Swiss-Prot record:
Transmembrane segments: none annotated. Mg(2+) binds at D99. Its main location: cytoplasm. GO terms for biological process: bis(molybdopterin guanine dinucleotide)molybdenum biosynthetic process. It comes from Shewanella frigidimarina (strain NCIMB 400). This is Molybdenum cofactor guanylyltransferase. It catalyses: Mo-molybdopterin + GTP + H(+) = Mo-molybdopterin guanine dinucleotide + diphosphate. One of its GO terms (molecular function) is GTP binding.
Length: 196
């Protein structure tokens, strides 16, 4: 029987480099940026969750479960991840950011294969050159470790990774899949690229 896999889209940040605009709701070629991410994930997972710390009513319009970080104060992606891990009943949780509209359509399958083959706790995507720290598949039992890490005042996701067995899956065959949008200029460049 195939494992159940849920996904959480992280849209809980403050988006300082986007002028404070909620990145998931920023228009990209006629759709909110998060819609591009949802479209890439909808056939890859059983259920989609959205982590948003503001504008929750707007995120709810897509019909998915929306939740804020359990710990207030914009503590970074780990805070959204640990809350999602505590909510899911799935065998695995896929984590992606809301500002990555070109995710691979085989993301989940390849991360799962890497995790299982290497008997790892989590699998992280790489663009062939750099690891993508917030594009990963992990087991829900890691919630306790992640919560303890946050409770100790830690925030750096790669430091938390080092406590666990990590598989890295290269997507060098799709080098632009993890292009993310942090500034209005990057948004315009990607909008032009998508329109071609």
């Amino acid at each position: 029987m195939a494992p159940q896999i849920d996904a959480v889209i992280l849209a809980g940040g403050m988006a300082r480099r986007m002028g404070g605009n909620d990145k998931g709701l920023v228009d990209l070629n006629g759709q909110a940026m998060i819609c591009h991410t949802i479209n890439k994930l909808s056939t890859q997972v059983d259920q989609i969750l959205i982590n948003a710390n503001r504008n929750q009513a707007q995120y709810e319009q897509w019909g998915y479960t929306v939740f804020s970080d359990q710990d207030s104060g914009y503590l970074g992606p780990l805070a959204g991840m640990v809350t999602a891990l505590k909510q899911t009943q799935a065998d695995y949780l896929l984590v992606v950011p809301c500002d990555c509209p070109m995710l691979p359509t085989d993301l989940t399958a390849r991360l799962l294969a890497a995790l299982e083959q290497q008997q790892a706790d989590l699998a992280v995507a790489s663009d062939g050159e750099y690891e993508q720290p917030v594009v990963l598949l992990l087991k829900p039992h890691l919630a306790a470790s992640m919560q303890a890490f946050l409770d100790a005042g830690e925030r750096k996701i790669d430091f938390w990774y080092r406590q666990h067995k990590v598989a890295v899956e290269s997507f060098a065959d799709q080098p632009n899949a993890f292009v993310n949008i942090n500034t209005p200029e990057q948004k315009q460049q990607l909008a032009t690229q998508i329109a071609k």
